[in-house]
């Protein structure tokens, strides 16, 4: 049975009753004109076609379950999805600019060729698939304990990808023009970055404390700097990365980093480092800075030209060149990094 309503006839109470009817399998809102549309929590296991809905703000209530189709919609600017949403969302070729998901959502999200640049914030414990291709975003941010599969490919925007604490999912980045990628504390997920253009791409990746995951950056052709927080024990592959210049670890690194055949210039690890560094055939390597306790495992075929020391570190110099100023860090850099991470986690939506 099909039933048709005009915009004036489809009141909030009628929409509520419509979704409470479990015989309702699909709702299509063509030329539905309202400033704001609220999808009630009574929406259960139905499809909602809003491709031609003329509303500027869409609110999906918590605990609802629906397949939401916003493809080609040129009117919705803001989308807010409540906690514990189940289903799917497709906003390909739409003009949405702000998307915010609540906590505990389990849904698949797709966007192929966005109409406008957008910002997306995913709440805590998000799971599902996030697939964004050939689109422009200003910021994508996930919350705590995300275990989704995130695919970002051939996107642009020159902004940030911020992954929240305790990430347990997979992040695949392919040819994304973003300024920075930040990974939160206690990451145990899998991350891969690939680029096809050395002039455009991600320049800097910042990984917070407690990293125990896997990250493959061998094909990150524009990457220049990787910074890893304290107590990291994961695996980082930078073998053959031509653009990498500096890799820095805070205290107690016990993981493995493979830099063979890369363009790395400067490697630094702080106190308590017991990790393994593979530095074979690194022709540009200029300075290796390691703590005095000599617990690190270093694989390198070149002999340093000189070795300096201070109260806490050994400095292995492999040439006479001075380290570029942009690769060294002032003593307060780690505090600034922690402050920036705190602000992004708690204040930037």
Residue positions per predicted region:
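Extended beta-solenoid/beta-helix repeat architectures
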Residues: 2-334
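Short hydrophobic helices that act as membrane-entry/anchoring signals
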Residues: 333-349
């Amino acid at each position: 049975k099909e039933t048709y309503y005009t915009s004036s006839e489809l009141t909030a109470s009628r929409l509520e009753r419509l979704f409470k009817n479990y015989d309702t399998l699909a709702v299509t809102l063509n030329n539905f004109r309202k400033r704001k549309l609220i999808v009630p929590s009574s929406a259960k296991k139905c499809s909602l076609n809003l491709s031609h809905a003329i509303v500027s703000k869409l609110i999906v209530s918590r605990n609802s379950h629906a397949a939401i189709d916003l493809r080609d919609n040129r009117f919705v600017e803001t989308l807010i999805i409540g906690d514990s949403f189940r289903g799917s969302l497709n906003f390909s070729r739409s003009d949405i600019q702000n998307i915010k998901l609540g906590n505990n959502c389990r849904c698949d999200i797709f966007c192929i060729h966005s109409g406008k640049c957008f910002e997306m914030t995913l709440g805590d414990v998000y799971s599902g698939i996030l697939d964004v291709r050939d689109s422009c975003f200003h910021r994508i941010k996930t919350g705590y304990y995300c275990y989704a599969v995130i695919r970002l490919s051939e996107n642009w925007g020159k902004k940030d990808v911020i992954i929240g604490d305790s990430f347990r999912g997979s992040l695949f980045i392919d040819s994304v023009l973003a300024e920075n990628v930040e990974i939160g504390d206690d990451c145990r997920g899998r991350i891969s970055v690939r680029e096809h253009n050395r002039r455009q791409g991600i320049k800097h990746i910042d990984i917070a404390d407690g990293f125990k995951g896997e990250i493959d950056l061998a094909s990150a052709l524009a990457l220049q700097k990787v910074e890893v927080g304290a107590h990291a024990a994961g695996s980082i592959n930078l073998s053959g990365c031509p653009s990498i210049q500096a890799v820095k670890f805070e205290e107690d690194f016990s993981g493995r980093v493979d830099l063979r055949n890369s363009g790395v210039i400067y490697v630094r690890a702080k106190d308590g480092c017991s990790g393994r560094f593979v530095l074979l055939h690194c022709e540009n390597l200029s300075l290796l800075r390691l703590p005095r306790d000599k617990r690190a495992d270093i694989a390198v075929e070149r002999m340093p030209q000189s070795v300096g020391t201070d109260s806490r570190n050994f400095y292995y110099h492999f040439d006479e060149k001075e380290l570029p100023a942009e690769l060294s860090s002032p003593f307060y850099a780690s505090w600034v990094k922690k402050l920036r991470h705190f602000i992004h986690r708690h204040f930037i939506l």
